[in-house]
Amino acid sequence: MVDQDWIKALVNIPISHAVGVVAASTVIYFLSSCFYNLYLHPLRKIPGPKLAAIGPYLEFYHEVIRDGQYLWEIAKMHDKYGPIVRVNDKEVHIRDPSYYSTIYTAGARKTNKDPATVGAFDVPTATAATVDHDHHRARRGYLNPYFSKRSITNLEPFIHERVTKLLSRFQEHLDNDQVLSLDGAFCALTADVITSRFYGKHYNYLDLPDFHFVVRDGFLGLTKVYHLARFIPVLVTVLKRLPYSCLRLIAPSVSDLLQMRNEIHERGGDEFLSSKTSEAKSSILFGALADTHIPPVERTVERMLDEGTVILFAGTETTSRTLAITFFYLLTHPECLRKLREELNSLPKVEGDRFPLATLENLPYLNGVVHEGFRLAFGPISRSGRVATQENLKYKEHVIPAGTPVSQSTYFMHTDPKIFPEPEKFKPERWIEAAEKKIPLKKYITNFSQGSRQCIGYTMAFAEMYLAMSRIARAYDVELYDTTKADIDMTHARIVAYPKAIPGKTEHVGEIRVKVLKAL
């Protein structure tokens, strides 16, 4: 009877009173959480603006409403408060190249990934999205053999074959006087390489007339909702469960990507394991599904599709954008291009200009071009915090409690004038000078991160850069077409760097396009 009386009382509460109670409770909760974060939180003594310390609200405004511009606010915080700042209620950001290896450590210290950075794409079983240190170490161990130096050396002939195909597309655009998108062409190249490595076959993306394909469109589509999905992780989960007819209306590029993923899932592992080709049997997917030493829960088709989604994204757009930006700088610095060609032309002739990777890696100027390209392309630009789980960290006089996400930003590392004088300039010579003076400049290139969670595909990315750059640079003369510095200047940080809108330009914003002038 008492229970029924309570129910009747609740039902009879006026709507206005109920709304008032909810509103008052919300205000009390908000004010109490602000008070706690400002005056009682373990990070209360870390410098920074109070508006950032009270919660994620300032970050939400600059990342979601202003579209990936919190990086610039963090820069202002450092300018005002110093090298260590509190960028939200939970996270500390440090701008100090000498401290990078302490955060992104390769030692025995257990370091988890910041959970706030892994939920946006809803691939919870992928290695890159694995929060726990030990679990990540085990999952990475399954993949390491496929990305070892030896494994990439064995992949060289295939990369060369794909570069040869790409050169034929350069010739096709020359013959037909067509504009060539370097972003699209290089993305097709890297996608062919990574799909072959993961699935055991490539999809001939380099054959597509305009290099327009699902993987790239899907990635670019997801970057547009990345920051919103970080704050509302269920967003992508909901999108994945919508009927394709609905999803196509909301996000057509994402719907195509998810449809491809689901088709692979429906075919299942048995069909894949029945493949007899040597390419399939050497792939990551085949190896993982067939290896009985791996626990069954770690080699399900669903988990491998999560793994494949991340590897495809990480192995296509980031490397291809770096290639395109590097060529942009070479084309706007003809003296650098001349020096590169002279160095390449000094090599003994080999069939098809298919120089071994080991030879190319030892060319000083090419090495400088590649590293300067990685430096100015930045790669993944969003913060990716690490969490020391077992001990406090100390930065100068500040103690950072265990369990606190701590991050540094690649952009600040790559543009630090103390490390890279005149950081805005493309200067391959800086790497030659550093090598001569035995300055370890390479340790400040962090687009692949560092430590135990360094990008597993960095050896493949370097191989693609060296092999593609060496052959294309000496094969064709090209010139930029409707492309300026504004197309590569970073304004928005959405996983990778994006430029701002360019007045008067409505198409191909941020795309590096060229006309092929002649074969060399």
UniProtKB/Swiss-Prot annotation:
This is Cytochrome P450 monooxygenase TRI4. One of its GO terms (molecular function) is heme binding. Trichothecenes are sesquiterpenoid toxins that act by inhibiting protein biosynthesis. InterPro entries: Cyt_P450, Cyt_P450_CS, Cyt_P450_E_grp-I, Cyt_P450_sf, Cytochrome_P450_monoxygenase. Heme binds at C455. Its EC number is 1.-.-.-. It is a single-pass membrane protein. The keyword Transmembrane applies. It comes from Fusarium sporotrichioides. Glycans are attached at N447. Disruption phenotype: Results in the loss of production of both trichothecenes and apotrichodiol and the accumulation of the unoxygenated pathway intermediate trichodiene. Its main location: membrane. Belongs to the cytochrome P450 family. Its cofactor is heme. It is found in: Membrane.
